[in-house]
């Protein structure tokens, strides 16, 4: 068992019965020219987040944790995104951006596109699981719950983008399904102003889970791991 220093209190878990979840580290969310950038969100400070996720993934894999990668998006025709009868059609900034700029149709968050791909620095390895998801929450219309329960996994460590959207949505849904969720704050990035990050982390540590950071996480898995990985 491992005890991780976190807010509001430490949490104990078995790494080999836990999963590190990497949420939507796609060009869409972390790279200039991707969907968030084109929609007017600032992605200029995502590079340190990518590096921190690399560090966390390496430490988690060495400790025997399952690594799960999410990719958010839809088919090329956007059938999976829902039509006018879906609130997603009206609230998705990617869909709204494409309606405003028709030349982008088929380029944002479409499976097979550059936008949909994971950033070059983050490459899933054999034994990892890569899951597509059609909505903010990784539990909605995906086999995530079944994958976790069949492996006896109850503790989830979250990284990725966006803290205040897909990361928080997935962690919240996990809370309702009796999963213990921890977010590594320096391995996440918000969509929007900095207060959105602070608000999401406040919600998580106060109501739905725990908040820690990459160095503390790596040190908890192995006291010498962070120095070695860094």
Curated annotation (Swiss-Prot):
GO terms for molecular function: hydrolase activity, acting on carbon-nitrogen (but not peptide) bonds, in linear amides. GO terms for biological process: nitrogen utilization; pyrimidine nucleobase catabolic process; uracil catabolic process. The active site is at residues 24, 133, 166. Disruption phenotype: Cells lacking this gene fail to grow on uridine as the sole source of nitrogen at room temperature. InterPro entries: Isochorismatase-like_dom, Isochorismatase-like_hydrls, Isochorismatase-like_sf, RutB. It catalyses: (Z)-3-ureidoacrylate + H2O + H(+) = (Z)-3-aminoacrylate + NH4(+) + CO2; (Z)-3-ureidoacrylate + H2O = (Z)-3-aminoacrylate + carbamate + H(+); (Z)-2-methylureidoacrylate + H2O + H(+) = (Z)-2-methylaminoacrylate + NH4(+) + CO2. Pfam families: Isochorismatase. Keywords: Hydrolase. Its EC number is 3.5.1.110. It is an enzyme of class 3 (hydrolase). The keyword Hydrolase applies. Induction: Up-regulated by the nitrogen regulatory protein C (NtrC also called GlnG) and repressed by RutR. Hydrolyzes ureidoacrylate to form aminoacrylate and carbamate. The carbamate hydrolyzes spontaneously, thereby releasing one of the nitrogen atoms of the pyrimidine ring as ammonia and one of its carbon atoms as CO2. Belongs to the isochorismatase family. RutB subfamily. The Rut pathway degrades exogenous pyrimidines as the sole nitrogen source at room temperature but not at 37 degrees Celsius, a restriction that is apparently a consequence of an inadequate ability to remove toxic malonic semialdehyde at the higher temperature (RutE/YdfG function). This is Ureidoacrylate amidohydrolase RutB. The lineage of its organism: Bacteria, Pseudomonadati, Pseudomonadota, Gammaproteobacteria, Enterobacterales.
